[in-house]
């Protein structure tokens, strides 16, 4: 029988450039019950370890779905049409949000991101990223000229995402993210 040798998609010398922390962010879920906490641990593990080559895009939804019990998810609170409902995979938006904040700090290209229909408690207003099928999905693209590595995990009641790669940005740069409330809408 003939043996076919296939070239590796990622070469060792490319991976050797992944040596610097480009951006990191953590959120707290100490008020979450066991089911929601389990969803955060499961979803973070599904994103953890992704390597993105230059120009490649990561979809939070594609990494984490399907949101089923068979895929390790539990029923927990989620937002749906302006209400709080129980849903399999409830809480995974905190994963998207934490990854979004790490991606902003790494200055990755944000291809797709939508906010929630209501305020969330784990980040300031406008700093969130919702997940609802492919309609509300976080997609980030590696706009660096070298590969990046995405690390995601929970420890205790903290969820963390860190993006690693080759740092090329000036060391003395300053990047600031501001959440400012410009008006309130009172619902009746």
Where are the regions that the model predicts?
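Well-ordered beta-sheet/strand-loop patches within structured domains
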Residues: 1-188
């Amino acid at each position: 029988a003939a043996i076919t040798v296939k070239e590796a998609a990622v070469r060792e010398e490319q991976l050797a450039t992944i040596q610097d922390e480009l951006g990191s962010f953590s959120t707290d879920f100490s008020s979450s019950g066991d089911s929601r906490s389990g969803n955060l641990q499961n979803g973070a593990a599904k994103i953890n370890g992704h390597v993105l080559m230059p120009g490649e895009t990561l979809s939070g939804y594609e990494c984490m779905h399907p949101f089923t019990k068979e895929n390790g998810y539990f029923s927990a609170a989620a937002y749906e049409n302006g209400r709080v409902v129980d849903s399999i995979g409830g809480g995974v938006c905190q994963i998207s949000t934490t990854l979004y904040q790490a991606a902003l700090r790494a200055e990755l290209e944000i291809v797709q991101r939508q906010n929630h229909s209501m305020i969330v408690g784990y980040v300031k207003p406008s700093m969130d990223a919702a997940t609802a099928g492919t309609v509300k999905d976080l997609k980030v693209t590696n706009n660096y000229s070298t590969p990046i590595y995405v690390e995601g995990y929970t420890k205790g009641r903290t969820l963390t995402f860190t993006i690693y790669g080759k740092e090329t940005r000036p060391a003395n740069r300053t990047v600031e993210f501001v959440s400012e409330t410009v008006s309130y809408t009172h619902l009746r």
